[in-house]
Amino acid sequence: MATFINLEDSPMFQKQVCSLEGTADELKDRCQKLYKGVKKFMGTLGEASKGESAFAACLEEFGGGPDDPISLSIGGPVISKFINALRELASYKEFLCSQVEHVLLERLMNFISVDLQEAKESRHRFDKAAHSYDQSREKFVSLKKNTRGEIVAELEEDLENSKSTFEKSRFNLVNSLMTIEAKKKYEFLESISAIMDAHLRYFKLGYDLLNQLEPFIHQILTYAQQSKEQSKIEQDRLARRIQEFRTQSELDSQQLVANAESSGANGNRVGGNIPYKNTETSLTADKEVIKQGYLLKRSSSLRTDWKRKFFVLDSHGSMYYYRTNGNKSMGSHHHYSGSSDHNTGVFGRFRARHNRSGSLTEGSLGYNTIDLRTSLIKLDAEDMDLRLCFRIISPQKTYTLQAENGADRMDWVNKITKAIGTLLNSHFLQQSPVRYLDKDNSSSAPANAVVSGDQIRHNDSRQNIGDDVSTILRGLPGNNACAECNAPEPDWASLNLGVLLCIQCSGVHRNLGVHISKVRSLSLDVKVWEPTILDLFRNLGNVYCNSLWEGLLHLDDDCEDGSALSHASVSKPCPEDSFSVKEKYILGKYLEKALVIKDESEANLSAASRIWEAVQSRNIREIYRLIVTTGDVNIINTKFDDITDIDAYHHIDAAEKAVKKRHDPTVCQRIKESNEPRSCLQGCSLLHVACHIGDSVLLELLLQFGADLNIRDYHGRTPLHHCISSGNHKFAKILLRRGARPSIEDDGGLSVLERAMEMGAITDEELFLLLAECA
């Protein structure tokens, strides 16, 4: 050891040992202070990590869940991406804290408790050995010359043992001190450097994470700015509408006052000068609101409360009022309160589109209908002391109503009188009033029915479709029986195969797997039966589908000599047959295609060319036939390159193909000249073409048979890219709901969301949220 030039036990040696011990003691003090600082640093890191996690949790609670309408309105799906990033950053802090603990704190503690402590204990052992050696030496040198030899020998042996122990403890002390001297040269540098490396990794991970989010952050900031500007425009528009509404209300009030004065001058003749439209025309035209507003309605109970109700009179002579729970009942009409709970919710329009609201704007308003066909109207109430009242008297009930002023009362009376006259002078009485409810029946109507009757009819028709799926589908040719065993009134269907099934055969279809047959119930799976699916079934049906899947059976029926029997050795099962018989038949029919007459392509026209033409001509049945009868399982993903020269638009040499060169769509000459993404079809699939055609039934058929949602064309564009570029937001939302990935970048390096925002502000909130959720 270079520090100890001479290892003899000398004053110089002892001085060096003392010097090293002093250094070790000072180092121990410093290490203890550093240990406390590291503990505090670790506590700070831990608190920072917990704080960031708590912040992320608060953001998550603020953003709400995926079905929360407030979450959707404030951009919850977008915030969720930032929440994930914050949690990642918190995990990085936690990892840094663990690195500090493992690399610095534990090693520092080990140095204090092991190395420095060993030096201290070595000093104690050395002092004890030195004292024992001194005593043995003193005893030995104090012997007289006449001391017996055995005593001398015993003390001499004891002296040698003491000296040996002393030397051993002396060198142990030296080793302990030199271990400290050696470690202090690298131990702390290594630990601190490792900590700095951990910091480097921490910041690098954070940078990489935020760098990946940077484009998305800027997109959201851009969108927020655009939304802010759009909101300002909408607020200005609302202010103008409010001003126009107030002006019009004042004009209407003045007109009502003038009409009331005119009616008073004519002896309060009700409906005296009201011009009648053509009765038949007004009743067959689209329903529109003639008058709507609040009236006080007197209850028929003993308490005779007055409640404020919203009444609507439409052009079909229907008068109804809404039963809101927000209005407070009044003990007397003199205690009228103008406050009513008719809040529609700031985000009502957005919520309605997502069908996620429990507010009064979402169709939860019950309403009662007054049958005007057998009613007459009288001014004033039974109690002549009450002002501004009128009565609607029918055989079932008398409605006592009170307006806010005389002009409003006369306007209501005149228009109701006109409606009664219109009903009495029409053939409408002969029609079954299925759309009206009696006074005791209630229904649910959308809030915007107050403004327009079109939405009421639309919702009613949608409800009827939902209730009559079985009737609609069974009404198609051959659909009154199971496609497999002819059992009557099938209650199940295969969405992609387009056939109706009995419950037993549907079980076999489920066992085939969803890649072969997607089985759904006609009555239970109500959300499945969208108009597009119903239209697809209208194009197919049991008769047409079985003409393909059971082609050889039908061929046998047409052959009188039985020459085709060798082609079809299977017979169609009956409803009474066992499950195993039906299973064997269905497996052979769909898995082996044992009864399908194979498609024989024309010499000059391949199956790929024919299905391409069928898609372009929207021939649903021909597409279905080619999918069934063609042996190529990939025909559903036929590309433009499969039917034409691959160099029709762009020449691809071997070198480009080898390096997979990217081809930015913005530099494509054909797209630039036409400004249409469909101009360059190279690499496009049937799904790309269907998105441009805009036929939802055609799109549904391709998706049902497993068309690749994320297939890319020559320019790296998916069908979703094409929908966004052409402004077909409806199809874009369909593809996103079915699993299309908007994160895929085209050969220009831009994702679907980036392409959409490149075209300007995304005004369709639902589309933006779908893009943000799936990105």
UniProtKB/Swiss-Prot annotation:
Q: Which GO terms describe its cellular component?
A: cytoplasm
Ranges occupied by ANK repeats: 682-711, 715-744
SMART domains the record matches: ANK (SM00248), ArfGap (SM00105), BAR (SM00721), PH (SM00233)
> Which residues are in the PH domain?
288-421
GO MF annotation terms: GTPase activator activity; zinc ion binding
**Sorted alphabetically, which InterPro entries does this protein's record hold?**
ACAP1/2/3-like (IPR045258), AGD1/2/3/4_BAR_plant (IPR035670), AH/BAR_dom_sf (IPR027267), Ankyrin_rpt (IPR002110), Ankyrin_rpt-contain_sf (IPR036770), ARFGAP/RecO (IPR037278), ArfGAP_dom (IPR001164), ArfGAP_dom_sf (IPR038508)
Describe tissue expression.
Expressed in roots, hypocotyls, cotyledons, leaf and shoot apical meristems and siliques.
Q: What does this protein do?
A: Probable GTPase-activating protein.
The Arf-GAP domain sits at 467-603
| Keyword annotations of the record | ANK repeat, Coiled coil, GTPase activation, Metal-binding, Repeat, Zinc, Zinc-finger
* UniProt KW Glycoprotein keyword: no
The family database entries (Pfam families) matched by this protein are listed as:
Ank_2, ArfGap, BAR_3, PH
Q: Does the keyword section mention Repeat?
A: yes
Q: Where is the BAR domain?
A: 2-226
Designated name of the protein: ADP-ribosylation factor GTPase-activating protein AGD4
What domain of life does the UniProt record list for this protein's source?
A: Eukaryota
Disulphides: none
What are the boundaries of the C4-type zinc fingers?
482-505
